[in-house]
Amino acid sequence: MGMTSDSIANLLTRIRNALMAEHLYIDIEHSKMLEAIVRILKQHGFVAHFLVKEENRKRLMRVFLRYGEDRRPVIHALKRVSKPSRRVYVSAAKIPYVFGNMGIAVLSTPQGVLEGSVARAKNVGGELLCLVW
């Protein structure tokens, strides 16, 4: 079981490395889970946009990264919380507020992949996938 068996950790690492190298986008193997996470990142202004494309019978997701006026990444940190080796579940009441509410928590819930404040409002908990700020 290498690193790549954790596709979410792989996504976060690929984004982190691409931002440090000032790349415009990353291409990553598509999955519904990863698309749901990236869609939340886009809604909260952490990535510019994304698209899903077929290439050599493989579905790829291209994620366009976002930089501020000063060419600095708008993302300061991406932290994987729950891991295949150690799952982390939280109730709605225990969903963390991230970085003075400037960041987000992403959860996998019975109602789908949700951002923390949305899950809190719906009063659903779930697996705490990652934190972004």
Swiss-Prot record:
Gene3D superfamilies: 3.30.1370.30, 3.30.1490.10. One of its GO terms (biological process) is translation. Signal peptide: none annotated. This is Small ribosomal subunit protein uS8. The keyword DNA-binding does not apply. Part of the 30S ribosomal subunit. Contacts proteins S5 and S12. One of the primary rRNA binding proteins, it binds directly to 16S rRNA central domain where it helps coordinate assembly of the platform of the 30S subunit. Belongs to the universal ribosomal protein uS8 family. Keywords: Ribonucleoprotein, Ribosomal protein, RNA-binding, rRNA-binding. SUPFAM superfamilies: Ribosomal protein S8. PROSITE patterns: RIBOSOMAL_S8. It comes from Chlamydia trachomatis serovar L2 (strain ATCC VR-902B / DSM 19102 / 434/Bu). GO terms for cellular component: ribonucleoprotein complex; ribosome. It comes from the Bacteria. InterPro entries: Ribosomal_uS8, Ribosomal_uS8_CS, Ribosomal_uS8_sf. GO terms for molecular function: rRNA binding; structural constituent of ribosome.
